[in-house]
Amino acid sequence: MANPNSSPLDTRQMETEDSETSPACVMTFNANDPSGAGGLTADISAIASAGSHSLAVVTGSYVRDTAEIFDHIAFDEDAVTEQARTALEDMPVSAIKVGFVGSPEIVSAIAEIASDYAEVPLIAYMPNLSWWDEEAIDNYLDAFRELLLPQTTVLVGNHSSLWRWLLPDWAGEKSPSARDIAKAASAFGVPYTLVTGIPMPDQFIDNVLATPQAVLYSEKFERFEAVFAGAGDTLTAALSALLA
């Protein structure tokens, strides 16, 4: 039984305490991955491990096993919009992460949502899409480049994937550097680019955060002689949580 002599806690004090103790919210747009390697599964795990709370918007689902992707089933863009806006109207969002969302229509829907939250950093991940139909790839990349890159704070992707996408006519004797790729991304409005998996001598790879003007940070890793999936989604989700 409550003590009748106790005074009620001031509502404003409760709200202040909640805001100070509640984890930051990261909205992530991504596909379900039944294998558990990437997609929303990776996002939710990585965001939680970095101390933030996921607002997970399902954009579709991969049809895959642990070895390869066979297909992708995209949701209707209205279903994606309804999920996102319902959560956004209820909870404050501190960062937005965009993974593979499956169709130009969903890219457009997310771009429209993001434009209403222009002050929130948007971290975009571009995975390897070589498993997909060539025409579908072209349409998706065109929509992403035109609609989402102008709103992107940090673009994340593997060196070869970003090279093929942003510098398709590269004619240099050497492969493009992280700064070269950052310059290409900057032409569409992206201030920061995190390029992963840059080949180095002696079985090492380099991950580099760059702007067109400078390399801001780099970290060298030993290359594993193994096939794995989900690293890009995990990295991008963790970065989103740290920026939230």
Regions found by a protein language model. Name each.
Residues 31, 35-38, 65-79, 134-139, ...:
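Active-site-adjacent loop and "lid" segments of alpha/beta metabolic enzymes
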Residues 46, 164, 226-244:
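Short, small-residue alpha-helix embedded
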Residues 30-35, 216-230:
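Short pre-catalytic strand/loop immediately N-terminal to key active-site residues, enriched for Gly-Thr
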Residues 136-216:
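Conserved phosphate/ATP/ADP-binding segment of small-molecule kinases
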Residues 51-55, 215-217, 242-244:
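Phosphate-handling active-site elements
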Residues 4-28, 44-131:
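Conserved N-terminal subdomain of the carbohydrate kinase-like
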